[in-house]
């Protein structure tokens, strides 16, 4: 077990503060399947992703309707614009992570779950169950949005993510990889147990930088891909809207986020935190 010792000064005296990394989550834990807390967490992920898709898809549709110049009195400058859409996505993530962090960890994104799995923060069983719940919630959330505003949903694209005209698939894939890297790197940094042990205010503030990361990435990548960085967010509307273009581009919104999440997990855990070096040192000391 890795151990860091920090010296803190208080009234001219030095005292040692020991910190131990929490044990890594097991790859497969059969006992976890018998615990209600696992299923409660999956339900929380389902509901959170449902609400996330419902609000954000309706925000996109509302913006497109308000800026539709075919409607008398509308101009291209009407509506919330890209800034408003980015705020809707970032704001909802902030709210939902805050609400569900103590129950499920507040992933609301298969890419985040995948990154945390690679970082040994969650087991394979929990990761798979979360991803299923997130995708199911996304489908239901997009379905609710269509149910409430069916005509506008069909007319304005249903919040589906596709590669924008003028950009090739390679550029779109790169945008998704980098955008997801920013998000997952922020998640690892905001939930770092060492920082949480040192600064008691960090866990309370964690939803804020995560939501703000989502906001900033949307500002940068909405013009390119519509911003996925969340496979469930792209999958749900694609299932409900069922458009050929959405399915043709769908792989970008899975491969990009998973690659970005993997790179972020490796960078944080094995370079910044030096987990590989610590593990090697522990192995040598035990030998």
UniProtKB/Swiss-Prot annotation:
Key words of the record: Cell membrane, Membrane, Repeat, Transmembrane, Transmembrane helix, Transport
Give the signal peptide as a residue range, or say none if absent: none
Q: How does it sit in the membrane?
A: Multi-pass membrane protein
Annotated region (Disordered) at 1-25
The organism sits in which domain of life? Eukaryota
Per the Swiss-Prot or TrEMBL annotation, the motif NPA 2 is positioned at 230-232
Q: Which GO terms describe its molecular function?
A: water channel activity
InterPro entries for the chain: Aquaporin-like (IPR023271), Aquaporin_transptr (IPR034294), MIP (IPR000425), MIP_CS (IPR022357)
Show where the record puts the motif NPA 1.
109-111
Q: Does the keyword Oxidoreductase apply?
A: no
* GO CC, one annotated term: membrane
Q: Which residues cross the membrane?
A: 41-61, 79-99, 128-148, 170-190, 202-222, 252-272
Q: Where in the cell is it found?
A: Cell membrane
What this chain does, per the entry, is described as: Aquaporins facilitate the transport of water and small neutral solutes across cell membranes.
Q: Which NCBIfam families match?
A: MIP
User: Domain comment, in the record's words?
Assistant: Aquaporins contain two tandem repeats each containing three membrane-spanning domains and a pore-forming loop with the signature motif Asn-Pro-Ala (NPA).
Write out the similarity annotation: Belongs to the MIP/aquaporin (TC 1.A.8) family. PIP (TC 1.A.8.11) subfamily.
Return the protein name: Aquaporin PIP2-7
Q: Which organism is it from?
A: Zea mays (Maize)
Q: What's the source species' lineage?
A: Eukaryota, Viridiplantae, Streptophyta, Embryophyta, Tracheophyta
State which gene encodes it: PIP2-7
């Amino acid at each position: 077990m890795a151990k860091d010792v920090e010296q803190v000064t208080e009234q001219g005296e030095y005292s040692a503060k020991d910190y131990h990394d929490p044990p890594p989550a097991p790859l497969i834990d059969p006992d976890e399947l018998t615990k209600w807390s696992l299923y409660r967490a999956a339900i929380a992920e389902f509901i959170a992703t449902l609400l996330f898709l419902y609000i954000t898809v309706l925000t996109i549709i509302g913006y497109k309707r308000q800026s539709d110049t075919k409607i008398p009195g509308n101009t291209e400058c009407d509506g919330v614009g890209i800034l408003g859409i980015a705020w809707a996505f970032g704001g909802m993530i902030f709210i939902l992570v805050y609400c569900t962090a103590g129950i499920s960890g507040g992933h609301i994104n298969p890419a985040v779950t995948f990154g945390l799995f690679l970082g040994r923060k969650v087991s394979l069983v929990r990761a798979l169950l979360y991803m299923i719940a997130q995708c199911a919630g996304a489908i239901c959330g997009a379905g609710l949005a269509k149910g409430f505003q069916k005509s506008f949903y069909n007319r304005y694209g249903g919040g589906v993510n596709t590669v924008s005209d003028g950009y090739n698939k390679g550029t779109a894939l790169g945008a998704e990889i980098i955008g997801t890297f920013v998000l997952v790197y922020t998640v690892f940094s905001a939930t770092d147990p060492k920082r949480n042990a040192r600064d008691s205010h960090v866990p309370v503030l964690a939803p804020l930088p995560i939501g703000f990361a989502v906001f900033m990435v949307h500002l940068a990548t909405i013009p390119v891909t519509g911003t996925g960085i969340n496979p469930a967010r792209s999958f749900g509307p694609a299932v409900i809207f069922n458009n050929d273009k959405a399915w043709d581009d769908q792989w970008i919104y899975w491969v990009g986020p998973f690659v970005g999440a993997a790179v972020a997990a490796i960078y944080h855990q094995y370079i910044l935190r030096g987990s590989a070096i610590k593990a090697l040192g522990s192995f040598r000391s035990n030998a």
